[in-house]
Structures are given as C-alpha cells and as structure tokens.
C-alpha cells in the first residue's frame, strides 16, 4: 500500500508508556522491530493517565536503551513537551546525543503539553496561546543549537549565552509537531519535518480541517506534501476475541475525556475517576475495535486516503505481545500487499 502521493506507507508501534514498566515496554519495542514494523514511539509523561497500575518512564532514558537493543526502527517521542518542565536547550542536547547513538533513527516529536505532566513538578500550566508561543520559540532555539557553533538567544521565554551543543549527529534529527487543531497544524506545515495527530475523531476533521491546514503551512514555507511525514496514531483494539477487543479499551478511557479535561486535569486519580464514569461504548468510540483483519484494513484505508503517510498503531490491551503477533500476521499483509 502506498499513500495518495506515491510514498511508501510506514507502519509503526506506539509503546504504551502509561501502562507498562520500562523493561517490559522495551521488550515490546524489540518485538515490533522483529515483526517488521518501521518505527517505535513513546510518550513522555511525568504522570500516567491512571494512578492505579499506571507507569510513566522517562522517554529520555528509555529511547537510548531501546536504540541499543534494536538496529533498524525509527525511535521517536509522541510526544514530548520541550517548553515547561524541560528547558528546550536540554532537549536539544539530549536528542542530538540520541541522533549520534542511533544515526538516522531518532525523531523528536513535540507538543504543547498537558497539566498532568507539568503541575506536579511546580510548573504553572499556561493558557493555550502561551503554550503555543513557547513551542514556536523552543523550536527556533533547538534548531539554532543544532546548526550553529555558538548560540546567544534572547527570547520571550528562553535565553542562551554562548551555548554550544558539542555532540551533533551528521544527519539532523527531524522535528515532528503534534497538533489536534488547525492553528498548530498549520505551524507544523511551516516549521516541522513531520506532523502527528491521533485517530478516532471523525474523518471530516482530518480531511476538511487538519490536513488542509497542514497544506497551508507547507505552501507558506514553499514546500509540498511530499516533503513532510504525515503521521497518525491509530487507536486499534484488535483481538481474535471480539469481547476482549472491546474490554481492552477500558484502561485507556481517559483518552475519551474532553480535550479541556485532558489538558487541564493535573491529578491521575481525578483523571481516572472521570474516565471510569464513561460507558464502555463511549470509550470504544476512539478506537477501531475489531476481530476481523479485513475490517481493520478497510478502516485504516480511510486515513491513507485522507493523506497520511505514517500509521502508528496503539493497542490498549495488557497482552501486547499477542497484539503484535496477531497484527503482524493478519493485518500487516493487508496493508502491505
């Protein structure tokens, strides 16, 4: 299968960092490479969506560990916030190092953040306008550190004085910008090497709002769609047992809360309480829930037809090894005939 612009379709695996301990999560990443997938992605939460049975390993530590255990897959954050609890200069240094250790494989996926991960460490969580402004400034700062020898930077939020990132990879680390609305999506088209969004919000959002906004940004920067990787995290609960496929979505009920709740609630205990009030039918709406490989492939095709070039699959169940085995055997051949 190729995308609508003739590019080979990439298939990736989203490591469920809020659900599994880091060692087990790394084993799943290794299996994803062994099963022939192209990329592995991890979020960078300080706190999980759920307090009970939740996990939140550091992406900055986990990614180099997985890089050492794999040899081929691209490794990225989906996503990391480089603007609040981190100084963007530290992120520039960390991902330059990762790019040296895993040449051509590292991806810095970034977003504007969630209160869940910032408030707990004493960081004031700003309004959307400021978070977006911080993100734009951080990208400028990171790119300067990656391209210039000595950087003095005077911004509204960040400052550098004679700063140098001494270890930089020969192949620059691409920056992917995550967005769920047209404003930041347009910015991704102007400034990003890639774009990230998530599935399950109605196909019209992607075909009529987000991807057109991305194209506007690309046109403003003098680029074409073929010059940006259009990535979507596809929420897929696939299991041979239909009842199990449905039940597996329950752990990830917080994803079905409103955007305002997900961005503003700072306590995993409260997040889980709100999520557990949702009926399973509402939770499952964010997911492709199926035991039929053909049905899955047909649902996924809609995102390819819309214009996405990189499909990253996030499975909600506890048995991730089972998912990877079944998905690779039954679904991938339909996506890569």
Swiss-Prot record:
EC code(s) of this entry: 1.1.98.2
Enzyme's top EC category: oxidoreductase
Keywords: Carbohydrate metabolism, Oxidoreductase
GO molecular function, one term: oxidoreductase activity, acting on paired donors, with incorporation or reduction of molecular oxygen
Binding site for substrate: 198, 201, 262, 286
Entry's Gene Ontology BP terms: carbohydrate metabolic process
Annotated CDD domains: Tetrahydromethanopterin_reductase
Binding site for coenzyme F420-(gamma-Glu)n: 44, 81, 112-113, 117, 180-181, 183-184
Domain of life the protein comes from: Bacteria
Catalytic activity: oxidized coenzyme F420-(gamma-L-Glu)(n) + D-glucose 6-phosphate + H(+) = 6-phospho-D-glucono-1,5-lactone + reduced coenzyme F420-(gamma-L-Glu)(n)
Keyword Oxidoreductase among record annotations: yes
Pfam family, one: Bac_luciferase
Gene3D superfamilies from the UniProt entry: Luciferase-like domain
Active site, per annotation: 45 (proton donor), 114 (proton acceptor)
Protein role: Catalyzes the coenzyme F420-dependent oxidation of glucose 6-phosphate (G6P) to 6-phosphogluconolactone.
Similarity annotation: Belongs to the F420-dependent glucose-6-phosphate dehydrogenase family.
Quaternary organization: Homodimer.
Record's protein name: F420-dependent glucose-6-phosphate dehydrogenase
Organism name: Kineococcus radiotolerans (strain ATCC BAA-149 / DSM 14245 / SRS30216)
Name of the gene encoding the protein in the UniProt record: fgd
